[in-house]
Amino acid sequence: VSSGEIVTIVGPNGSGKTTLFKAIIGSAPIASGKIIMSPSVKVGYVPQVLNVDRSLPLTAERFLSLVNNRNDQGLLRAQQILGSEDYLSTQISSLSGGQLQRVLLARALLNDPDVLLLDEATRGLDQPGSAAFYKKIEEVRESSGCAVLMISHDLHVVMSASNRVICLNGHICCQGEPQSVASSPEYRDLFGSNIDGTFALYQHNHKENKSRINHSNA
């Protein structure tokens, strides 16, 4: 994964997408293959689901303060995501879906990451909410130059917003530029051929930079 690159991982449920992300952040063992990561790389992670005990008194502000490795640049980026929103004093369990995703994104940015991992980060959001969230992601990518590695079931987003697509089904079925993957037999076997009419939720310009993470058979 190169700086500034947007790579999207697709595949059916149970294909290993979330497990791959957990392996990257070190919370799941690697069954085979290896992940090669630069020793200095910083990773931010937005999980698919945040499991919080609803009886636990935890405000959004307190939740953000629990991050230990934050830095000044990360704090600035997190503040830009949150803006002047007044829900920081709200209990995490009471936040709307869109508010929670902003808080999770802000938390992932506190260490000013080189690579941002998004595990179905717009799950549960409606189309306007998803579009607003992806716009924030693009703003972060443009301002920081970080790479974005995301899992998504929204094939419109995948085909319009990614520099590269990796299709998993227990192994790498196919990978490459979006249109190349969309026309591959392996992809069509999984998702069908109805990929016309995709739309861009945001625009992006990819700049080639030094690779930060290499993935090999994991």
Which residues are covered by each model-predicted region?
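ABC ATPase nucleotide-binding domains
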Residues: 183, 191-218
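Conserved ABC ATPase signature
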Residues: 91-95, 99
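Hydrophobic anchor residue at the start of the ABC signature
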Residues: 105
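H-loop (His-switch) and adjacent beta-strand-loop-beta switch element
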Residues: 165-177
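H-loop/switch region of ABC-family ATPase nucleotide-binding domains
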Residues: 152-153
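Conserved ABC ATPase "signature" region
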Residues: 72-87
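Catalytic Walker B motif of ABC-type/P-loop ATPase nucleotide-binding domains
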Residues: 116-119
